[in-house]
Amino acid sequence: LAAVSVDCSEYPKPACTLEYRPLCGSDNKTYGNKCNFCNAVVESNGTLTLSHFGKC
């Protein structure tokens, strides 16, 4: 089973697009896109991880 991950090295960003490509975080919350998810990862000091692509 391959671990799913997202490269968040270019984040945080001050603004995210409204593009809808959902990701499910380890907090069981659905993030609208990679930018929203990566900003949350940065804010969590790396404790938030990707559970899977798509809605939770």
UniProtKB/Swiss-Prot annotation:
Kazal-like domain boundaries: 6-56
Site residues (Reactive bond 3), renumbered to this chain: L18, E19
Family annotation (Pfam families): Kazal_1 (PF00050)
GO CC annotations, alphabetized: extracellular region
InterPro entries: Bifunctional_prot_inhibitor, Kazal_dom, Kazal_dom_sf, Prot_inh_Kazal-m
Keywords: Disulfide bond, Glycoprotein, Protease inhibitor, Repeat, Secreted, Serine protease inhibitor
Domain of life the protein comes from: Eukaryota
Sites where a glycan is attached: N45
GO molecular function terms noted in the UniProt entry: serine-type endopeptidase inhibitor activity
Keyword Secreted: yes
Subcellular location as annotated: Secreted
Disulfide bond entries: C8-C38, C16-C35, C24-C56
Record's comment describing the protein's domains: Avian ovomucoid consists of three homologous, tandem Kazal family inhibitory domains.
Record's protein name: Ovomucoid
